[in-house]
């Protein structure tokens, strides 16, 4: 059975969407959506000049290993807030502690560049389940940040609209049909990213819609709005997806191999 690392929210599955209690919410429909522009960047220790605070429809995605940091370890540690240090201290083992610190250091480094301020001065507001909000100190523009983990990877998404990330890793030792497992994991990643973006609002999603062959698709959830889902190539058996509450027009990608196929 596939699992998502570090998922602290309620447990949902596509099968649960057929429950009678959700019938009154109406059916979800798949709507047409255009393929966004993708701009790939190598993982680097400075941001390109053409990368700015994301506007509506723009998305920044970072993928890196826990060992990668844009600055020396000691410098990055000095950026962490008191509450972040306490959270790191309370992690149950060294590996999870290191992963948490790496993700927070990189988030502060990225947002510091986007806001043109010192990383230690970035005011991050935790919204739970690895979701963070930050507001520009001068013009008040806000961004949403989501962090997901899977295998050796840390994935960070940044947008001006609500978003949700999901990374699905098959359970160690599980034996399944390869094709079926891949498709199930992809549906699971899409569904979990929707759940994360919606903050676990229960919605009626047909499992067949989650099996769309397109790597970018949009779901009309009625009163909950239209949400745009993008598959992320991760390699191996890992599957990932990101959901955004706005049509995707431009996606900046950091850390994916050159030539990676999106959508």
Please identify what each model-predicted range represents.
Residues 2-263:
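Core catalytic alpha/beta fold that binds nucleotide/phospho-ligands
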């Amino acid at each position: 059975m596939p699992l998502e690392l570090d998922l602290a929210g309620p447990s949902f599955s596509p099968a649960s969407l057929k429950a009678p209690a959700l019938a009154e919410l109406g059916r979800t429909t798949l709507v047409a959506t255009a393929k966004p522009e993708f701009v790939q960047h190598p993982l680097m220790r400075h941001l390109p000049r053409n990368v700015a605070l994301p506007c509506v429809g723009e998305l920044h995605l970072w993928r890196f290993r826990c060992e990668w940091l844009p600055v020396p370890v000691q410098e990055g540690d000095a950026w962490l807030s008191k509450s972040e240090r306490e959270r790191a201290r309370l992690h149950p083992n060294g590996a999870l502690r290191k992963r948490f610190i790496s993700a927070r250091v990189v988030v502060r480094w990225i947002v510091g560049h986007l806001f043109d301020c010192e990383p230690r001065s970035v005011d991050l507001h935790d919204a739970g389940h690895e979701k963070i909000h930050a507001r520009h100190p001068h013009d008040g523009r806000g961004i949403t940040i989501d962090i997901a983990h899977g295998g050796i990877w840390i994935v960070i998404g940044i947008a001006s609209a609500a978003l949700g990330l999901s990374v699905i890793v098959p359970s160690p030792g599980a034996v399944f049909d390869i094709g079926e497992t891949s498709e199930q994991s992809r549906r699971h990643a899409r569904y979990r990213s929707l759940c994360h973006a919606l903050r676990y609002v229960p919605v009626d999603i047909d499992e067949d819609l989650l099996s769309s062959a397109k790597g970018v698709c949009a779901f009309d959830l009625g009163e909950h709005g239209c949400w745009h889902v993008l598959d992320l190539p991760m390699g191996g058996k890992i599957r990932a997806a990101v959901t955004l509450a706005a049509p995707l027009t431009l996606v900046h990608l950091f850390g994916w191999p050159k030539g990676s196929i999106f959508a």
